[in-house]
Amino acid sequence: VKACRLENGEIDWTGLDVYIGVDLAETTDNCAVVMVAYVDGVVYCEPLAFIPEARTDEKSATERVDYRHFIKQMQCVACGDRVVDYAVIEEYVMKIEEQYGVKIIDIGYDRRNAMSSAQKWERAGYNVTEVEQHSRTLHAPTKLLKECILNHQFLYKANELYEINYQNAKCTEDTNKNKYVNKKRSAGKVDMVVATIIAVYIMQQHEIFDTGLDWGIQTA
């Protein structure tokens, strides 16, 4: 993924339609919000991680990741005490349009930990879509993301923490050869990758398939 890194300067997001992917995980763990846009066949990406502030040094030691450095680099936000403060994440998402000059088309989320936040965004007037965390749903955006990266059709501002997430990520195949990032089998934190895949899924539905959101609930 490093080959897709924008070494100097910023991505100009002004006027773009964007899609937000949210992985809130557990409140004691890392969370991530990722914004993507699809422009002339290229996926633009802006990731941000969130961690519990009081666990910053503990996580840095156990994960061998210098979170204080990444906080200074504005690649990570420390909030809350020993659990992530979801209110900080909710407010960040609701300020994206003003901060970047974009139009949020849809916000994708995993229902396990984000139902309350999604309801708040919906009440604030945003479109929100639950993205099922199942291989049959995640295979297509995972495949598209991989292809965009390999073809250098993916662009993000230099972000070492984001790259570490990719190094940690391990893909698994189900019995139907559907590939997805498996958190349990990954070597470390992959929340920013998962949030990217959620955002790409939403983007794919609107920009590429344009057939409406169609997904099923896994009951077993």
Report the location of each language-model feature.
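Short, surface-exposed amphipathic charged segments that create phosphate/polyanion-binding patches used
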Residues: 142-151
